[in-house]
Design a protein with these regions (language model features):
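Residues forming the flavin
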Residues: 1-254
């Protein structure tokens, strides 16, 4: 009931990704515990609405921090990959918060800042030099509550000393994970997964959309962490491969 059978000659799997759940593996971030601990996605919604506030009281924050690599580059939870876009998005959102709230101090706690392409110049340095966003290399180990603020605790790895920073708003830069749709398509079409749980591409670096199943191609974050440009490029390549496969099949039939 509600199902429809469709006969097709080729398939492009473009099932995207899902965001890491920062409360799924550990409560060190206090995501389900403290209202003022949110994610990049939550922040993007507020920025689009033109109203960045603390969820706990509806007031504009005076101190905000981003915590990078939440659910990425983490062997303890098994996510041993860089999600590729989090650093750039955090810098973009940091700039937008400073534009919206000029008196708000913004911090970014990071392991390494990984900026791809022109983001290094257009976003990263712009955030530091023009908008005075504070970048602190360190490891966050715990988020607690003190009064009406959340307190970020960890280590400043550059200075080699303990870190404790009271914040009004903590933003978690959550990484990418294989989506449920990717897992379902893998089972449905018997597509092998690579070691991280994404659909395996067998075409090498010059042909990243080919899978182990003839006529089935993969695009975007279904094959691994990807930004918008990667996804669009792979989508176009997969569509061309699918069209070529269909044409080849029709020529054989003729």
């Amino acid at each position: 009931k509600g199902e429809e059978k469709v006969d097709v000659g080729s398939i492009v799997v473009a099932t995207g990704f899902q965001h890491f759940d920062p409360g799924k593996e550990t409560q060190m971030y206090g995501y389900y515990e403290f209202d003022d601990v949110i994610t990049l996605v939550d922040t993007e919604r507020m920025l689009k609405a033109g109203n960045v506030v603390r969820p706990s009281n509806g007031e504009a924050p005076k101190q905000v921090c981003f915590i990078q690599c939440v659910g990425s580059r983490d062997r303890q939870i098994g996510n041993q990959w860089c999600s590729k876009v989090c650093c750039g998005i955090a810098c973009k959102e940091a700039i937008e918060i400073r534009q919206m709230l000029p008196e708000c101090r913004v911090f970014v706690f990071y392991i390494d800042m990984r900026m791809y392409g022109f983001w290094e110049d257009e976003i990263y340095w712009k955030a530091q030099e023009e908008y005075k966003v504070n970048f602190i290399r360190g490891i966050v180990t715990e988020i607690t509550k003190r009064g009406d603020q959340v307190v970020v605790k960890g280590e400043d790895t550059t200075m080699g000393r303990p870190l404790e920073a009271p914040m009004d708003l903590v933003i978690l830069s959550v990484g990418m994970e294989p989506s449920e749709g990717t897992t379902q398509m893998s089972k449905l079409f018997q597509l092998p997964l690579e070691s991280h749980g994404y659909i395996e591409s067998i075409g090498g670096a010059l042909n990243t959309v080919v899978t182990a199943v003839p006529g089935v191609f993969v695009a975007g974050a279904a094959a691994g962490p990807a930004d918008l440009e990667d996804s669009v490029s792979m989508g176009g390549a997969a569509a061309m491969k699918a069209a070529a496969y269909l044409r080849k099949a029709s020529l054989k039939a003729a």
